[in-house]
Amino acid sequence: WMLQGNRGDEQRRFQTEAEEVLELSPQDRNAWLIEALGERIKQNLDDPDTWLHRARLYVERQAWDEAANDYVQVIDLSQDIEVSESIRTAARVELAALPELFRRVVELRPDASIPWIGRGQYRALRSQWEESQSDYARANPTRAITDETFAYAGLSLLTDDRQGYEQLCADLVTRDEDLKDGYAAYVAARTCSIGPATAVQPEQLVEWASRAVQQNQDAWLLNALGLAYYRAGHLQQAIEALEKSNAGRWKRLCKAQNGLVLAMAHHSAGRQEEAQQWLQQATVTIDEARPKDASKPAPAYADDWIALELLRREAEGLIRPNDTADSEEPQSDQ
């Protein structure tokens, strides 16, 4: 970052300074960098990246109050839609991992969504469903129709808040203007299919998902379309969409969502051998990815990890009812 925006002699001067800084002790280097970033902040108060760099340096010193003040600046500046999503993501992840910092930041900005979403994701990836739902609820996850909307809906199901899930989906149906956007339509289709919601007609799910796929045929959009077709009883179309999703670019673990729905679709079509094969393949993939250490995160986005848990429960209950009835193993958050 020291060399950004500098040219010629100025860049060479900064290069020399950088080499000198590397020779300092870690503590002195930290202090030098904090001071240098402070000068840069004075020149441009509106650069969240610089605030974030300095916040991390304060964290290294365990200067929690100073770090919290800088993270608050990052949060405030992140309200600008032009700010890179990577900045928001970094702030969410870093705040969630440091309780001392998180506490101070939410005291300063109790209504900011970034800290709560970050900790909700942190907890969801450790299968701490109830704690995660509580955090997402603080973030107003339905204000905009995003992956956080889906995550909160899924967490409501995982914590047996079926009424809350149904109300969320009923509210989505009324947001016609928002749902003209392909991404919002995808989120709505996925959200209301995962239950599925009784408040939404199955053909409406297909319409929303199709709207998204018309704009882009990414694997995750096709997954939502396949699930919507399955909910509407269009089994062959569901299978075709899910197989097309499997052929696209998506992480193997994420594609296990396709496998679980394919298992249910083949089961509903009377093809039990195929259903068992898809279910076995998907569950093995999930089990291989699940961290053995419960304090470690699953290697997925929070919304995908939530979807995998819900779809697995449903598929196993449908295809292996005796196994699920006999199993008394608690979920990791129960």
Task: List each model region and its residues.
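Residue at a conserved register position within TPR or TPR-like alpha-solenoid repeats
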Residues: E19-L22, Y58, R92, R123, ...
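"A position-specific structural signal for the A-helix of alpha-solenoid helical repeats
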Residues: F14-E17, V21, H53, I87, ...
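TPR/TPR-like (Sel1-like) alpha-helical repeat modules
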Residues: W1-N6, A68-D80, N140-A144, L157-R175, ...
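Short coil turns that delineate tetratricopeptide repeat
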Residues: L45, Q79, P110, R143-A144, ...
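TPR-repeat structural position
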Residues: Q27-N30, W64, W129, R162, ...
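TPR alpha-solenoid repeat register
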Residues: T50, V83-S84, P115, E148-T149, ...
